[in-house]
């Protein structure tokens, strides 16, 4: 992902103006407590998503290229699609961002999405995608949102647009967390503390190969039960 400017230029015939990244996470303590307002203790992983953006001055369309899928999609509305899941997250971010900033001019964009986060493995690839997109939009439009507010907007995307009744943990640690530190979060008040991890500790993350997709699982049902 170090050659994102070359790839951006090859796809859109221009250089990007802004780029941001967001990382995947693993939760050490606190499953199901984030969306019930409890305490959690996640930390960042090395896997990340990078989103690069520039204004599209050639046409009145949004153009997005996702390197993992090797797929380019163009659109000019924010209607949720039925068969292109990754583009829904981008549309949702744009919808929430413009809804939050109703006085902004509708500027069409070119966006490059690059990621090495394993998908559907329960390490929050979707939250990292939303956070990276929103941070790039925040910089592009020079809004000045704090990282905590970016996390809140990312949660709105997943809840109000995508339709997953998740908590705030994933978005908060992806937006604010620091490598090498655990992220203690009170999910009710959103107060947090960065905690040093002991140097002599080693955490192993094991892939069960069970694919996870909250939109198609009983996640929302479990959320409502609690």
Language-model-derived ranges and their functions:
Residues 1-127, 131-147, 152, 166, ...:
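ATP-binding N-lobe of GHMP and related small-molecule kinases
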Residues 36, 143-226:
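ATP-dependent small-molecule kinase catalytic core of the GHMP/sugar-kinase superfamily
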């Amino acid at each position: 992902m170090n050659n994102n400017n070359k790839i951006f230029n090859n796809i859109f015939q221009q250089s990007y103006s802004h780029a941001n990244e967001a990382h995947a996470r693993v939760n050490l303590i606190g499953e199901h407590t984030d969306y019930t307002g409890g305490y959690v203790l996640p930390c960042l992983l090395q896997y990340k998503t990078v989103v690069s953006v520039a204004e599209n001055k050639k046409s009145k369309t949004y153009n997005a290229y996702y390197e993992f899928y090797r797929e380019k999609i163009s659109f000019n509305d924010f209607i949720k699609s039925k068969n292109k899941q990754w583009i829904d997250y981008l549309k949702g971010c744009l919808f929430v961002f413009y809804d939050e900033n109703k006085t902004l001019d509708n500027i069409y964009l070119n966006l490059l999405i690059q990621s090495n986060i394993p998908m559907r493995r329960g390490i929050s690839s979707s939250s990292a995608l939303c956070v990276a997109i929103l941070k790039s939009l925040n910089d592009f439009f020079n809004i000045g949102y704090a990282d905590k507010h970016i996390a809140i907007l990312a949660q709105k995307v997943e809840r109000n647009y995508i339709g997953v009744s998740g908590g705030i943990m994933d978005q908060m640690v992806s937006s604010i967390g620091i490598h090498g530190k655990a992220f203690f979060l009170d999910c009710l008040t959103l107060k947090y503390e960065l905690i040093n991890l002991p140097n002599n500790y080693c955490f192993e993350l094991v892939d069960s190969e069970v694919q996870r997709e909250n939109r198609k699982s009983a996640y929302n049902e479990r959320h409502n039960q609690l």
